[in-house]
Amino acid sequence: MIKNSYINEKLNFYQKSFLTCMLLIVIVIVYFFSKNYLDKPKNSYVHTKMMTFLTNSNELNISKNLIWTKKTISGNLMSLKLAKVYVINNQLEKALKILEKSKNNSVDLNFFNLISFKIAQIYFQKNNIKKAITTIKDILGDSWDSIRNNFIGDVYFKLDNQKRAVTLWKRSIIQNKKIEFEKIIQMKINNYN
């Protein structure tokens, strides 16, 4: 009788352990599936909103008018939004045209630098490396040195000059004291090595 109770207790322990493990596995699976399921509508919502903006000619004309005629921060913001819509829809020339105009109308140095950076990214995406480097060098101010060096490092990496890229990325880490930025750049360097 004592042996039987010991076996039953042992069996109950294994059954409980098995059920606990299965329950944890089910919870993890449900968590990851629900997370992916919830992320998709958000992305499709953003895409739908951008497409609506692009196809709504009245809103588009108001935005373009604001960009072309006014030298204001709201015009700069609108140009960034419109350029993002064009880039998402792979209309890079239109995005460049909008950003170039906004860059010329920029009233704030940081907006000028941000718009220059976005223009350089588009040239980089179009594989126009010389224009990308020329544009990124238009960025003024010491506070942008880290971003500039990181981007130029990416350009050199694409040109198969990995040593120069790593040097620029390391310089970028030194110039930017943020831990998150350092981790991202360190991942680039580690992937090279």
Swiss-Prot record:
<dbReference type="InterPro" id="IPR026039">
    <property type="entry name" value="YfgM"/>
</dbReference>
<feature type="topological domain" description="Extracellular">
    <location>
        <begin position="35"/>
        <end position="193"/>
    </location>
</feature>
<comment type="subunit">
    <text>Interacts with the Sec translocon. Forms a complex with PpiD.</text>
</comment>
<comment type="function">
    <text>May mediate protein transfer from the Sec translocon to the chaperone network via its extracellular C-terminal region.</text>
</comment>
<dbReference type="InterPro" id="IPR018704">
    <property type="entry name" value="SecYEG/CpoB_TPR"/>
</dbReference>
<keyword id="KW-0143">Chaperone</keyword>
<keyword id="KW-0812">Transmembrane</keyword>
<keyword id="KW-1133">Transmembrane helix</keyword>
<protein>
    <recommendedName>
        <fullName>Ancillary SecYEG translocon subunit</fullName>
    </recommendedName>
</protein>
<dbReference type="Pfam" id="PF09976">
    <property type="entry name" value="TPR_21"/>
</dbReference>
<feature type="transmembrane region" description="Helical">
    <location>
        <begin position="12"/>
        <end position="34"/>
    </location>
</feature>
<dbReference type="GO" id="GO:0005886">
    <property type="term" value="C:plasma membrane"/>
</dbReference>
<dbReference type="InterPro" id="IPR011990">
    <property type="entry name" value="TPR-like_helical_dom_sf"/>
</dbReference>
<feature type="topological domain" description="Cytoplasmic">
    <location>
        <begin position="1"/>
        <end position="11"/>
    </location>
</feature>
<keyword id="KW-1003">Cell membrane</keyword>
<keyword id="KW-0472">Membrane</keyword>
<dbReference type="GO" id="GO:0044877">
    <property type="term" value="F:protein-containing complex binding"/>
</dbReference>
<comment type="similarity">
    <text>Belongs to the YfgM family.</text>
</comment>
